[in-house]
Design a protein with these regions (language model features):
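Interaction/scaffold regions that mediate signaling and macromolecular assembly across diverse proteins
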Residues: 1-223
Length: 223
């Protein structure tokens, strides 16, 4: 049986992508009971599914309604279980297990609310960073995340993103990757782990290559 809350998250993302009215669905989110949400999202796969879909839906909704740039990530406009969250709360508090936005992922923020701590994942999955930026991919292969196949979806979106956003300079032996991999380096396991990830995806030996980071901006790419 499908999980009610992940199904609701799938629906609101689908409607937001079509730029249709999401207010009835947002009302349902607001009146969810925290105890039921916590009990229902009892695995990391369910948590990742629900919160990635909610994040991407409200990214689109907030961008459309406010017409703002980078400020949208701090705006408290996401009303769930009578709590009000920002995109940053979901990304860094829930999906990154209450980390500071800065600090490369090495510093935990003890000041997040009990609401966020109750709903946070038990283990950080570096692939969520690609899932939260998947709306900006030129070629989109995933309509929404589904808890029954989320492992495969996260692997797919990671592979797609890296193939599209990574540049090789064979002459200088350098690889340019999006700078959010540096910003959240600990989530990826460090610089060596980033290189191993690239080696797996491109199926080649990159030990003689240097990694360089290029600016990546979600808002500018969507506007």
């Amino acid at each position: 049986m499908k999980n009610y809350y992940t199904t609701l998250s799938e629906e609101i993302l689908s409607v937001a992508k079509l730029e249709k009215d999401t207010i009835p669905l947002r009302r349902q989110l607001f009146y969810i009971r925290l105890s039921k949400l916590e009990k229902s999202l009892d695995t990391d796969d369910l948590k990742k599914t629900f919160w990635i879909n909610i994040y991407n839906a409200f990214y689109l909704i907030t961008l459309k309604e406010t017409k703002q740039g980078k400020e949208i990530f701090n705006l408290k406009r996401i009303k769930i279980a009578r709590a009000i969250l920002s995109l940053n709360d979901i990304e860094h508090g829930i999906l990154r297990k209450y980390k500071f936005r800065i600090g490369y992922g090495y510093i935990t923020n003890p000041f997040y609310s009990d609401f966020i701590k109750k709903l946070a994942v038990s283990k950080v999955d570096y692939r969520i960073h690609f899932a939260l930026r998947s709306l900006n991919l030129a070629q989109k292969t995933i309509d929404y995340f589904d808890s029954e196949v989320i492992e495969e979806q996260l692997t797919t979106v990671t592979t797609d993103f890296i193939h599209l956003e990574t540049e090789f300079d064979e002459e200088s032996k350098t690889i340019q990757v999006s700078d959010f991999l540096l910003s959240y380096l600990k989530d990826f396991g460090g610089k060596n782990s980033v290189k191993k990830l690239l080696e797996r995806i491109f199926e080649r030996d990159l030990k003689n290559y240097k990694i360089r980071f290029k600016t990546y901006n979600r808002v500018e790419k969507l506007l």
